[in-house]
Design a protein with these regions (language model features):
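Basic, nucleic-acid-interacting segments
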Residues: 1-313
Length: 315
């Protein structure tokens, strides 16, 4: 499926990278995959009353390392915030994340294509904790729609994530796929994550809108989730772009919402209205002091990153 002639997609990506530190982001529980359900937990990651988080220094260092590889500015001081929402996989009722003072921001990535180099801006790369894993039992798709029962495995809850947010500089599904392949290669070479989409250590959401070719306007965007391979991401983007073109050409209005993409059928299933920052009621995390990246990274960071990788990102 391709985008109809006369239109172009406008695509931005949100990439979640699960770091392979030995312990979780704010507690001493082991950060391992494949253990029996709900065996890698403690009062901190289960949000028992009175417990306090303690940041994982290695996760902070690795997030800075990735930010440097993406050409980001590293903050002298960054803050953690509470991102408030109520899902069963979030026992505190909020996620510890970063809002207006991220660890890394303002990066730039050059992706070589067959006919040119594509420059993609990096808005930010920030640290946060992962939610638990929800398992939907029954139904045909393994998702909440039509499921008989939902189970929660808290082993994943609290594991360290870096979220990378790109500018909407991508204009095709193929450009998105190429960028993600190079990004994954970089992450693996840095040694900070396995970055495997099959196991969820690399997860990608795509924000998609369309506009008349040659236009500079930014129209209403939607978000696509649950795409677990680069080829599925490309197919999901193309399907959503084609759907939006049909809506606009039919005289309708695209609604800002979130979709699940079913790679088997090619169907896009509405999930919920897409949230904005105000919906999460961010406020500073009172139980954590500001993060001040080690002076080592400001002094030797770029050289350290070059020693950690076999080739620059843009090759």
């Amino acid at each position: 499926m391709s985008v109809p002639a006369g239109w172009e997609p406008v695509i931005g990506l949100e990439i979640h990278v699960q770091l392979k530190t030995r312990t979780k982001m704010f507690c001493r529980c082991a950060n391992v995959w494949g253990e029996p359900e709900n065996t890698q937990t403690c009062p901190v990651c289960l949000a028992h009353p009175g417990v306090l988080p303690v940041p994982n220094r290695r996760a902070i260092e690795w997030a800075v390392k990735l930010g440097l590889a993406l050409g980001c500015r590293i903050a002298d001081r960054a803050y953690f915030h509470r991102k408030n929402y109520f899902y069963p996989d979030l026992p505190k009722g909020y996620q510890i994340s970063q809002y207006d003072s991220p660890l890394c921001e303002g990066g730039r990535v050059v992706v070589p294509l067959a006919d040119r180099d594509l420059e993609i801006g990096i808005v930010r790369a920030h640290l946060e904790e992962d939610a638990a894993k929800t398992i939907h039992v029954g139904g045909a798709t393994g998702r909440i729609h039509g499921a008989d029962t939902s189970l929660v495995d808290f082993n994943r809850g609290g594991t360290p994530l870096v979220e990378i947010v790109t500018e909407p500089d991508i204009r095709s599904a193929e450009e998105a796929r190429r960028f993600l392949q190079l990004l994954r290669q970089t992450i693996v070479e840095l040694g900070i994550s396995d970055a495997e989409m099959e196991t969820g250590t690399l997860r990608v959401d795509a924000n998609v809108s369309v506009r008349p070719a040659g236009s500079t306007e930014l129209r209403t965007r939607t978000e696509i989730k649950n795409m677990n391979s680069f080829s599925y991401i490309a197919r999901g983007i193309e399907a959503e772009a084609a759907r939006q073109v049909a809506v606009w050409e039919g005289g309708g209005e695209v609604v800002q919402e979130t979709f699940d993409f079913d790679a088997g059928t090619g169907a896009l299933t509405p999930r919920r209205a897409k949230e904005e920052a105000d919906d999460y009621r961010y406020f500073p995390e009172p139980d954590l002091v500001p993060v001040e990246p080690p002076a080592f990274f400001h002094r030797e960071g770029p050289r350290h990153v070059r020693r950690s990788r076999r080739r620059p990102f843009s090759s």
